[in-house]
Structures are given as structure tokens and as C-alpha cells.
């Protein structure tokens, strides 16, 4: 799980992305697990979600 977090953060350093794009860049096979991890990271303040654009970005 720690490796998945690192993969997500490195993917977001390139540019903000939608969930499916993040899954491809971070090499995560399960969309549900990816969304769950993103929500946990959002609660911790590591990432933000722009509701108007539908993009995840580094917090």
C-alpha cells in the first residue's frame, strides 16, 4: 500500500489527473482500491480533488 501511495504521488507530480488516468500511470489494477486510497490521502491532506474539473492534484 505504501508503494501505491508513492506511485500515485509521483503520477500527480507530472500533472493533475482523473482517477482512471492515475490508475494507468500508477499501475493500479483495481479502480475501487485506487479511489479508496485517494480518499484516505485526501483526508490526510496529501492530495486534493477539484470537483469542477474532476481532477486529483497534490495537496
Question: What positions do the PLM features span?
Answer:
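Short, cationic-aromatic polyanion-contact patches
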Residues: 1-2, 49-59
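Short, leucine-enriched amphipathic alpha-helices that occur as contiguous helical runs
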Residues: 1-9, 31
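Short acidic, hydrophobic short linear motifs in intrinsically disordered regions
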Residues: 16-26
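Residue-level "edge-of-site" marker
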Residues: 25, 36, 54-55
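Short amphipathic alpha-helical interaction segments
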Residues: 29-40
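Glycine-centered, phosphate/nucleic-acid-interacting loop/turn motifs that mediate DNA/RNA or nucleotide
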Residues: 45
